[in-house]
Each structure stands twice: as structure tokens, then as C-alpha cells.
Amino acid sequence: MGLTLGERVQHCLLVLVSGLFLALFRLLSPGTKRPKHLPPITNPLLTLSAVQLAEKIRRGEVSSVEVVQAYIDRIQEVNPLLNALIKDRFSAALLEAARADKLIKEENGGEEVLRNQFPLLGVPMSVKESFGLQGMPNSGGLKSRGKVLASVDAPPVALLKRAGAIPLGVTNTSELCMWMESNNHLYGITSNPYNLERICGGSSGGEGSIIGGGASVFGIGSDIGGSIRMPCFFNGIFGHKPSRGVVSNDNQFPRCSGLQNEYTGSGPMCRYAEDLLPLLKIMAGPTADKLTLSKAVDLKKLRFFTIVDDGGSPLTSPVDRQLVEVQKRVAARLEADLGVTVQEVNFPQLKYSYQIWDTFLALPDKDGKPPEAFVELMADGGSVWPVWELIKRIFGRSEHTVAAIGLALMESSHSSKSSEFILKQKEDLQREMEDLLGTDGVLLYPSHPLLAPKHHHPLFMPFNFSYTGILNILGLPVTQCPLGLSKERLPLGVQVVAGLCQDHLTLAMALYLEKAFGGWVDPGVV
């Protein structure tokens, strides 16, 4: 038994209509001049990892004030082009940097004491606006929440600050953090540092853009369908969605409801692979004990697998040939360097990735309480009628984006009963994937079927996120790794997946792939 006839017809119509509108959009879009990218980085402090900066600051080789000021200067240089950081706290950050420098001068216990107590002392960071950062906006990109300020820090933000990190500000998201382009009617649209005509991804797109543009050392994102991994892929940086239940999702807006907390992962985003593990360890707090992050990894003793696409879902775009080829190059490099065999595998259930993601996000919690409806989040205590919002949008009068209105309309067409076929597909996929990976398996899987699309084009390819979304439902750890640039000078990349609580394996792979393929590339020199 497969999808019902009605479900198949609905999905086919969505794909057909999306394709027709994309063709029309391309036809009517005005031509533009040669795409612009960012100016190159000139300050060498901006090319150091968080680990390196923390060490230099502790040793007095550079002051925290110097580092923070260098990043403020870079933000002021590139943010007018990117629109990634939507509210800064530069004055407060400089005061905190001065206090960090004072603490270092007065510490009698030496560098080791500082390293143990404050591993990130004096290092600047950025924060996704949906996370609570005390005194800063916390709207989730919803215009009606434009004056809402966070009263407390989200737990992972608090842990990073306690470790000595200094927030520079908060970054843009998609409306209600449920779309793959960071655009809303409160802050506007955020661009890709490698090509300003392209999307930066979502919903942690502001983080991806500001970090990829060399204007933040590292940041923090949340991921319910790829919201860390897609921005990291499009912006050429590293990101990690942890195993389920490792990092707290509290004090974020939108809040998780139903079973969404199980499928949402908060994690680090950065330009350098060596930062991933220490950042994850700090963000997880005591829950880090669920993982074996300090365990040494011998890549030669791992088993490697690769999946080249989702099996041909009619809802998703074919995987770009350059992404197929770079994933093959990763497999070949692993075999040559490590003497291992990378086995190509296939899971027929992946063809239903979108339907699985959509079904499981709508399930009630253990007490039978359903998740808060998307349209209720849009209404923010008032009332919203999606059809009326669409009409208003046509005349430029709606406070909501086309993407959010479309999601609300799709939600209203959902069946109240979950498909038994889809429930079984997920159950089978979960079992087979966990059996395959075990405690020593690593899987390569495309990050997205396309390179960073042009602005607004995802509206006509709405299901491509399912390449990342399916892994949220499985709850497995995934590290997004950059793999150089395409012929269009856009980032290439791959997802690296491991078994539950085997995060240390994917983080070790990130270090290997950075060395093998070069890691992050300054977008100003492309």
C-alpha cells in the first residue's frame, strides 16, 4: 500500500504549479548586473578559529578588545550588503571584552585555570534571533513581535556566555523559522556572501551569512528541518545538528510543541572544523555526558556508506551534477587515504522524506496534545485567515511573507489522520538506518539537491529541504561540511551522518574533510 490517490494527485499538482510559477518568475524577473560578492578579509584576526583566538587572548598575544573591534569593523563593512545581523550590541560587547582583558591580567592561576573556567574567554560570537539573548529582539521574524525583547538567555546561549564568549548581536531568520530563505517583513531579506543574488538559507540564514562572510567567529542555530545545515551548506561553513535531546531548545521562539522538541536540534555553526566539538560540549552542558566527545576516532576503523539521492522523489529537484561528483570525490579520497571501502546503499523510504517529516511534525505529544498550529503562531494571539492574507499580499498589504502564507494554506489542507503507510515508512527507515550505522558507521548524503538558489526561487521548489528534514525525524547526528566551490563559485558540501549519540564520528569526519578539501573559502577572493 502506498500513498492514497488523493495524496498523489495533491503532490503532483503542487509540483506542477510550482514549476509553472518558477518558469513565469524567471521570465518576468528583470536582468541584473554581474553578481557581487563581499570584499576580501584584510585583518588576519578574522581568519583564526575560536580555539586559536581564545588561546591568543589567554596568553596576552592579542586583547579581546582588539578581536571584538576587528569583528565589529568587518560587520560594518559587509552587513550593509548582507543584512544578516539585524540588531547589534557593540557597545556592550566592547565593555565585556575589556572586562575579559582585565580578568586575564589579574588571574594568578595562569593560562590553565582560565582555559578550564572560561574556554571561550573574550571570543566574539553571533546568535540567531529566535534564541533568547537577554535584552535583544526575540521575534522569530514575526512582524507583530517586533518590540519583543528576550528577558533571559536561552540555555545554550547562557552556557556559551558563561564560557566567556561575547555576543555581538542577533541575526536574521525566516518568518517563524519555518522556511529555507531568511526573509521576513520585520527585518527584510538576507543575502549569500558568495553571491548577493542568492539565498543564504534558513531559518538560521543570518548566522550562515554573517559567519560565511567572515564577520563572526561562530554562532548558534536551531534545526527542525535543516535550519542549521542548509545555511551552512549555502554559505560554505561547518554546522552540527546534534543527536536528539543533547542541547536544550528552551527559551526560543517559536517554541516547540507536540513532538517537535524531539526533532529540533540546536547546535554550533562555524568556519573551522576544530571549533565544532568544543562548542558542542559547552552548549550541551551536563547532557554532553550522553556523548563520547573525548573518545579518539580512528577513521580507518570506521565503515563508510554513501547515498547519492533520495531515490527519485517526484517532489524534489534532481541532485546537481556537481554535488554528485564532489560526493564521489569524497568517497574516492576516503578509499585512497584510509584504505576503506565506501559502499553505496539505498533506502527506498527516502522517496517519502517530505511526507515523513510533515507527518511526524504534526503528531501530538505523549499526553495527546497536538502541536501549536502554524497559523496560530502567525496570528500571535490575534486571528489570521491565510486566504485573506494571500489576497492582501498580492496588493502588498500583508505583514506575512508568501512562504509563511503558503505554509499556513498547506497546513489547512492536512488530513487529521496520519497515513499508516507513511508511519510504517518511517519505522522501517529508522530501524534499517540504525542497523546500518551502528556505533561505527558513517553515511554521506547530499545536503540539498541544488546549489544556493537565487532569491525567492525556493518558493517554487518547496520540498527540496526534505534532504535535511528526514534526518531530523530520525534524530541522528549530522555534520554539514563544506567541500570547496562550484564552477559558479558557490559552495559545495555534504552531510555526514552517524548513529544516535555517535556525534564524535561526524565531528572527526569534519576535521578530515576540512584538511582534504580545504574547508571554508573567503568569499571575497572567489
UniProtKB/Swiss-Prot annotation:
Hydrolase in keyword set: yes
Keyword RNA-binding: no
Membrane topology, as annotated: Single-pass membrane protein
Cell location: Membrane
Keyword terms of this UniProt record: Hydrolase, Lipid degradation, Lipid metabolism, Membrane, Transmembrane, Transmembrane helix
Gene3D superfamilies xref list: Amidase signature (AS) domain (3.90.1300.10)
Catalytic activity: N-(5Z,8Z,11Z,14Z-eicosatetraenoyl)-ethanolamine + H2O = ethanolamine + (5Z,8Z,11Z,14Z)-eicosatetraenoate; (9Z)-octadecenamide + H2O = (9Z)-octadecenoate + NH4(+)
TM region(s), chain numbering: 12-32
Name of the molecule in the record: Fatty-acid amide hydrolase 2-B
Origin species: Danio rerio (Zebrafish)
